[in-house]
Amino acid sequence: MSTAVLNKHLADAHEVGHDHDHAHDSGGNTVFGFWLYLMTDCVLFASVFATYAVLVHHTAGGPSGKDIFELPYVLVETAILLVSSCTYGLAMLSAHKGAKGQAIAWLGVTFLLGAAFIGMEINEFHHLIAEGFGPSRSAFLSSFFTLVGMHGLHVSAGLLWMLVLMAQIWTRGLTAQNNTRMMCLSLFWHFLDIVWICVFTVVYLMGAL
């Protein structure tokens, strides 16, 4: 009788260990797959950057970057996005500690910062269009709106993903699946920060000089 019980416990332990290994492998595959997606996104952004570089001087008699860019405004945008990257890092640290409430709180702060960034970007676009400097004004402005707008759409998608993730953590806790999702969103969010630094340098900083 005792041998049968012992064998049952060993079998159960083996099954639990197998399930844990399977979950670990599944999470690793998900993160690897997301890295592949980010590489395709790199190609996409590189193509749009190249297009902008070709068209930057095609102003068709309209304004150049030096005429329309407001560096102090864009610096505030940049600072907000960079701080949001730090707050997301704090959310990850909280998740590693198993602090569900702290993780959700830091994700909420990150969401608010990201929303503020998008709000400022929309305000910038509205101001330019109201001044008659919309995307149809010149090839330069068309490429500018495409590049900056595409980054903004990615940030908006990240914000939507963040809302869904906060709801999942709130209802299910910091499960292995949710931790994997947090890792993937972390890669995405930091990737967008790096892209924005490139946008700020190539488009705004070089354009304003």
From Swiss-Prot:
Which is an annotated Pfam family here? COX3
Q: Keywords in UniProt for this one?
A: Cell inner membrane, Cell membrane, Electron transport, Membrane, Oxidoreductase, Transmembrane, Transmembrane helix, Transport
Gene3D superfamilies membership: Cytochrome c oxidase, subunit III, four-helix bundle (1.20.120.80)
Q: Which GO terms describe its molecular function?
A: cytochrome bo3 ubiquinol oxidase activity; cytochrome-c oxidase activity
Q: How does it sit in the membrane?
A: Multi-pass membrane protein
Which branch of life, at top level? Bacteria
Q: Which GO terms describe its biological process?
A: aerobic electron transport chain; electron transport coupled proton transport
Q: Cellular component GO terms, alphabetically?
A: cytochrome o ubiquinol oxidase complex; plasma membrane
Output the InterPro entries linked to this UniProt entry: Cyt_c/ubiquinol_Oxase_su3, Cyt_c_oxidase-like_su3, Cyt_c_oxidase_su3-like_sf, Cyt_c_oxidase_su3_a-hlx, Cyt_c_ubiqinol_oxidase_su3, Ubiquinol_oxase_su3_dom
Which ranges does the record mark as transmembrane? 30-50, 73-93, 103-123, 144-164, 187-207
Query: Which residues are on the Periplasmic side of the membrane?
Result: 51-72, 124-143, 208-209
- Disulfide bonding pattern of the chain: none
Q: Which stretches of this protein does UniProt put in the Cytoplasmic compartment?
A: 1-29, 94-102, 165-186
Q: State its location(s).
A: Cell inner membrane
What function does the entry list?
Answer: Cytochrome bo(3) ubiquinol terminal oxidase is the component of the aerobic respiratory chain of E.coli that predominates when cells are grown at high aeration. Has proton pump activity across the membrane in addition to electron transfer, pumping 2 protons/electron.
Q: What is stated as this protein's family in its record?
A: Belongs to the cytochrome c oxidase subunit 3 family.
Quaternary assembly: Heterooctamer of two A chains, two B chains, two C chains and two D chains.
Protein name, UniProt field: Cytochrome bo(3) ubiquinol oxidase subunit 3
The organism named in the record is: Pseudomonas aeruginosa (strain ATCC 15692 / DSM 22644 / CIP 104116 / JCM 14847 / LMG 12228 / 1C / PRS 101 / PAO1)
